[in-house]
């Protein structure tokens, strides 16, 4: 691998360890030329299904869009960035596990809601209010009552 500091190909791995529950390998590398150290992450490249939107159009899965929606729901909530990444990785893992080439956007929304329910109940309600298109306070109340059970 090329050194990001001096662009030479003389780099060696000095440490490797599993991260993200074993789905990634973190490697510390050292350049043989300039002796700078840097970190790389390696993971299997698997196909994530395309998303079928509610209007029938299809688009590639967008991890940034998922992350943005989850982070928006978690805004000002006490949830670590590491927990958010684990939730996103779990959603992606579940999408890959379907074995389908295309999945409905509703599935992504349901998976996100399930992860948010585990992370933070307030964020779950925030996300659900948009995802489920709450029209009035009664719908909030019904969803909150479901959480209490």
Curated annotation (Swiss-Prot):
Name the needed cofactors. Zn(2+)
Task: Zinc fingers (unnamed): give the ranges.
Answer: 3-34
Per the record, a Pfam family?
Zn_ribbon_NrdR
Q: Sorted alphabetically, which InterPro entries does this protein's record hold?
A: ATP-cone_dom, NrdR-like_N, RNR_NrdR-like
Q: Which GO terms describe its molecular function?
A: ATP binding; DNA binding; zinc ion binding
Query: Which GO biological process annotations does it have?
Result: negative regulation of DNA-templated transcription
The cofactor binding remark recorded in the entry reads: Binds 1 zinc ion.
Q: Where is the ATP-cone domain?
A: 49-139
| Record keyword Transmembrane present | no
- Which keywords annotate this record? ATP-binding, DNA-binding, Metal-binding, Nucleotide-binding, Repressor, Transcription, Transcription regulation, Zinc, Zinc-finger
- NCBIfam families per UniProt: transcriptional regulator NrdR (TIGR00244)
Q: What does this protein do?
A: Negatively regulates transcription of bacterial ribonucleotide reductase nrd genes and operons by binding to NrdR-boxes.
Record family assignment: Belongs to the NrdR family.
Q: Which PANTHER family match?
A: TRANSCRIPTIONAL REPRESSOR NRDR (PTHR30455:SF2)
Name the record gives this protein: Transcriptional repressor NrdR
């Amino acid at each position: 691998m090329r050194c990001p500091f001096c662009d030479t190909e003389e780099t060696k791995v000095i440490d490797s360890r599993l991260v993200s529950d074993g789905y990634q390998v973190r490697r510390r590398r050292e350049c043989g030329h300039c002796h700078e150290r840097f970190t790389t992450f390696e993971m299997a490249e698997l196909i994530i299904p395309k998303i079928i939107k509610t209007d029938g159009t299809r688009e590639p899965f967008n991890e940034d869009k998922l992350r943005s929606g989850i982070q928006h729901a978690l805004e000002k909530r006490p949830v670590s960035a590491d927990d958010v990444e684990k939730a996103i990785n779990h959603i992606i893992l579940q999408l890959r596990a379907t074995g389908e080439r295309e999945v409905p956007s509703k599935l992504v929304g349901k998976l996100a809601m399930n992860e948010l329910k585990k992370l933070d109940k307030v964020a779950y309600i925030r996300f659900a209010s948009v995802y489920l298109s709450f029209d009035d306070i009664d719908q909030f109340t019904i969803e909150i009552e479901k959480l209490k059970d």
